[in-house]
């Protein structure tokens, strides 16, 4: 089986919340794609409930695109501790952390249910599994801990 970087990461050594560049891939025609670890909660100590995580996912899909160029996708980890962010080009972890922080601030303070995209039967594959209340509570908790641009040394942006 192929070696997967995220399964070689020492999850006991990282200090969430943080942004980590996992890899930058260069295509045959010169295109560049970057993959980031947006770790919101400490691995093996907490996990975001699925309804809250699902709502955060829908909101980050839009909010990160408003704050950064080149966002391709933002998808949750199966362990429910954060997200993969895939982008065109290369962004510093500081730039990504600032965009994430601003997005979580919007979720915590400004977003209403009417702002959450894709929450009906036609636009979501599990539309009943959402919680804006949970998303807001998690956003507040994550922000209170600060988002680092380094996974091992706390460098809060």
Swiss-Prot record:
Q: What molecular function terms (GO) are annotated for this protein?
A: iron ion binding; S-ribosylhomocysteine lyase activity
For this chain's record, the cofactor binding note is:
Binds 1 Fe cation per subunit.
Q: How does it assemble?
A: Homodimer.
Q: What does this protein do?
A: Involved in the synthesis of autoinducer 2 (AI-2) which is secreted by bacteria and is used to communicate both the cell density and the metabolic potential of the environment. The regulation of gene expression in response to changes in cell density is called quorum sensing. Catalyzes the transformation of S-ribosylhomocysteine (RHC) to homocysteine (HC) and 4,5-dihydroxy-2,3-pentadione (DPD).
Name the enzyme's class: lyase
Could you list this entry's UniProt keywords, alphabetically sorted.
Autoinducer synthesis, Iron, Lyase, Metal-binding, Quorum sensing
Q: Which reaction does it catalyse?
A: S-(5-deoxy-D-ribos-5-yl)-L-homocysteine = (S)-4,5-dihydroxypentane-2,3-dione + L-homocysteine
User: Is Signal a UniProt keyword of this protein?
Assistant: no
Q: What is this protein called?
A: S-ribosylhomocysteine lyase
Which cofactor does the UniProt annotation name?
A: Fe cation
Report any one BP term from Gene Ontology: quorum sensing
Q: Which family does it belong to?
A: Belongs to the LuxS family.
SS bonds (residue pairs): none
EC number, UniProt record: 4.4.1.21
List of residues binding Fe cation: 54, 58, 124
Which organism is the protein's source?
Lacticaseibacillus paracasei (strain ATCC 334 / BCRC 17002 / CCUG 31169 / CIP 107868 / KCTC 3260 / NRRL B-441)
Q: Which InterPro entries match?
A: LuxS_sf, Metalloenz_LuxS/M16, S-ribosylhomocysteinase
- Which superkingdom? Bacteria
Per the record's keyword annotation, is Lyase included, yes or no? yes
Mind giving the lineage of the organism this protein is from? Bacteria, Bacillati, Bacillota, Bacilli, Lactobacillales
Q: Which NCBIfam families match?
A: PRK02260.2-4 (NF002606), PRK02260.3-1 (NF002608), PRK02260.3-3 (NF002610)
């Amino acid at each position: 089986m192929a070696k997967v970087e995220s399964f070689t990461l020492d999850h006991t050594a990282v200090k969430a919340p943080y942004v980590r560049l996992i890899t930058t891939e260069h295509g045959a025609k010169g295109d560049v794609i970057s993959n980031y670890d947006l770790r919101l909660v400490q691995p093996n100590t907490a996990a975001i409930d699925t309804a809250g995580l699902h709502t955060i996912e829908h909101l980050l899909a839009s909010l990160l695109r408003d704050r950064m160029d080149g966002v391709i996708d933002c998808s949750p980890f199966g362990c429910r501790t954060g997200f993969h962010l895939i982008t065109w080009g290369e962004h510093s972890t500081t730039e990504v952390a600032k965009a994430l922080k601003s997005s979580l601030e919007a979720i915590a303070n400004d977003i209403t249910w009417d702002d959450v995209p894709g929450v009906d039967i036609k636009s979501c594959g599990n539309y009943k599994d959402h919680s804006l209340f949970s998303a807001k509570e998690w956003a507040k908790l994550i922000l209170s801990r600060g988002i680092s641009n380094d996974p091992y040394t706390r460098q809060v942006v």
